[in-house]
Amino acid sequence: MISRRGLAMGLAVCGLAIGSSAQANELLIDRSITKNDVLEAQRAWCAALVDISKAYETGGQTAAKALAEKVIDSAYAYKAGGVLFKPTLTVNPQTVRTSREGALSYFVGGDPEYPNDKGFALRGWTSCLAEDNAIIILGETATSLSKVRITNKDGSVVTVDKTWQYIVDQEGRLRIVVHHSSLEHTGE
């Protein structure tokens, strides 16, 4: 019977090692999300909403759609496996959008498959601010509950309650996998 020490010595002679002492070529991948990552993702989402509105004002539907496609591809995880997206102003039977096309239609309208979509991002938004109520970070996922205040060019403010859940994709980018939004309850 060979002892553990004898086996280790034999493996060492052969150029092999056992246990935790082997540290050559150690690879550590840390995809942990930080609070700052979440806050930056929310700022970017708000900025993109305003930018799509501006693109619509200056370049029409075509410009807004082109920008919205880029935003969806960079912010959401449709290409990385899927998204649960429940936008603010949707109605049955198309309340939840699990496809990129459904999200695009919600933001800019114009898709006959979604005839009730008017283009939420085309409403003349001039500012957007996410105020966090809570953030939970669990390594490679993070969830936030926020009040998002969106102002249009007339100065009217719409407040929505948002839940965003993020993952880190294979390229190390933060992506939205859950986006639930509803109008703030006013008690009336």
Label for each model-derived stretch:
Residues 10-12, 22:
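Cleavable N-terminal signal peptides
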Residues 23-75:
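Short, low-complexity N-terminal intrinsically disordered segments enriched in polar/charged residues
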Residues 1-10:
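Bacterial N-terminal signal peptides that target proteins for export
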Residues 59-132:
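A solvent-exposed, acidic/Ser-Thr-rich amphipathic alpha-helical stretch
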Residues 137-145, 154-187:
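Short beta-strand edge/turn micro-motifs at domain boundaries
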